[in-house]
UniProtKB/Swiss-Prot annotation:
Transmembrane segments: none annotated. The keyword RNA-binding does not apply. GO terms for biological process: meiotic cell cycle; sporulation resulting in formation of a cellular spore. The lineage of its organism: Eukaryota, Fungi, Dikarya, Ascomycota, Saccharomycotina. This is Sporulation protein RMD6. GO terms for cellular component: peroxisome. Required for sporulation. Required for meiotic nuclear division.
Length: 231
């Protein structure tokens, strides 16, 4: 079967932390652009996902364990997404299963990046930060088009299972953003808890950053066991 036309860049946060302002700013704006879609559509959350370039890593929760956190990007054409791409990134050998070929994975072959990622060629983003033993939490999950988020989630999870021995992933979602069905039916998560956040709790620390919001909303905690993960 023909190879999957997917290109996934794996960015260890330890390398990203040392990278240039241009590199970090491009990811900061891309992630905020993805979160702006539900933020503006539903009008509940006022503050951007990442408040500033200086709070990029703390707002996404990477600062708690930078060494074991990663950010994945789904790119349509790596050579258009990052200048002189192959001088800065090298390919990981893809593994093929019976159903389809896996995408091409790339990792940095340098200790810091200097250029900006072109947001027009970045189709989705997802970050993973340690939650507890053999468990990681999703952060910075965006999709710039139909199906891109699902594709990146599935392929990034495969890499997390094989390279980080990840056995489960957890996620906190906002119920009023109509994400429950997406996480349950498309990604295979199950709900384990939900709680209400009251408007009177101004700037409550809901996720990893302080959130400004216009009315009460619910946070749903979800989990996915990866033992039976299938594409």
């Amino acid at each position: 079967m023909s190879a999957c036309p997917c290109n996934i860049v794996i960015l260890p946060v330890e390398i990203l932390k040392n990278s240039s302002k241009d590199t970090k700013y491009s990811l900061y704006t891309t992630i905020n652009r993805g979160y702006d879609v539900p933020r503006l559509k539903y009008g509940i959350i006022v503050s951007p996902r990442v408040h500033s370039l200086e709070t990029l890593f703390s707002d996404l929760g990477f600062d708690k364990n930078i060494e074991k956190s990663s950010l994945y990007l789904l790119l349509n054409d790596p050579t258009l997404a990052y200048p002189n791409f192959h001088e800065h990134f090298e390919q990981l050998k893809g593994e093929t299963n019976k159903d389809l070929s896996l995408p091409t994975y790339y990792i940095p072959k340098v200790q810091f990046l200097t250029e900006a990622f072109d947001s027009e060629h970045t189709l989705a983003t997802i970050g993973y930060k340690p939650n507890n033993k053999e468990s990681y939490e999703i952060t910075g999950f965006t999709s710039m088009g139909n199906g891109y988020g699902i594709k990146l989630f599935n392929y990034s999870v495969i890499h997390m299972m094989r390279s980080h021995k990840c056995k489960r992933v957890v996620a906190d979602i906002i119920m009023e953003h109509d994400l429950l069905g997406y996480y349950e039916k498309k990604l295979g998560f199950v709900e384990v808890q939900r709680f209400k956040v009251l408007k009177e709790q101004h700037q409550v620390k809901v996720f990893d950053d302080k959130v400004d919001f216009t009315k009460d909303f619910h946070v749903i905690k979800m989990i996915k066991e990866l033992g039976n993960h299938r594409l």
